[in-house]
Amino acid sequence: MNPRRKKRLAIVGSILIGIGVVSGLVLYALSQNIDLFFTPSEITQGKKETGLKPSLGQRIRIGGLVVPGSVKRDPENLKVSFRLSDMAMPIVFKDSDPMVTVYYEGILPDLFREGQGIVANGTLTEHPPTGLSIEASEVLAKHDENYMPAELAEAAGQKHDKATYSDKQLESKKTNSY
């Protein structure tokens, strides 16, 4: 092999190795930032289709209803804990239902209340008295009575509909246009 061909082969080889290293680093970074969505029953029993359960220390999103009477606030600081249950209809909470305790330190959203649907982002941990729990870094409450995130609507067995205008609203929009 002549020197020019060797040099070209070395350049192409180093470029391919560089692309491989960069691709590996990008995939590693993306895998660290993925938050999979689970309901309380999927955390305790696994997903229906695959049986997939989250592992301890994994970052996840959990959605469900705040169980009435489960909210406990620490009077000394902003720590709060509450239990989440599935959004099954009719809404009846039994002790036998799969529930997950969420621990959060911070200011809760204004719309947060018992019996309300929420989504929490955090890490799956295990606390001896409560079992599987979430150390939440963020808690989101739903906006109004009719709004439900697509993930929660799917978990509750409801269809997620986008907001639409009624015929009356469309008619008034046409007549009020300039």
UniProtKB/Swiss-Prot annotation:
Cytoplasmic side: 1-8
GO biological process, one term: cytochrome complex assembly
Localisation: Cell inner membrane
InterPro entries membership: CcmE, CcmE-like_sf, NA-bd_OB-fold
Entry binding sites for heme: H143, Y147
Biased composition (Basic and acidic residues): 157-178
Function description: Heme chaperone required for the biogenesis of c-type cytochromes. Transiently binds heme delivered by CcmC and transfers the heme to apo-cytochromes in a process facilitated by CcmF and CcmH.
Family classification: Belongs to the CcmE/CycJ family.
Protein name per Swiss-Prot or TrEMBL: Cytochrome c-type biogenesis protein CcmE
Organismal lineage: Bacteria, Pseudomonadati, Pseudomonadota, Gammaproteobacteria, Alteromonadales
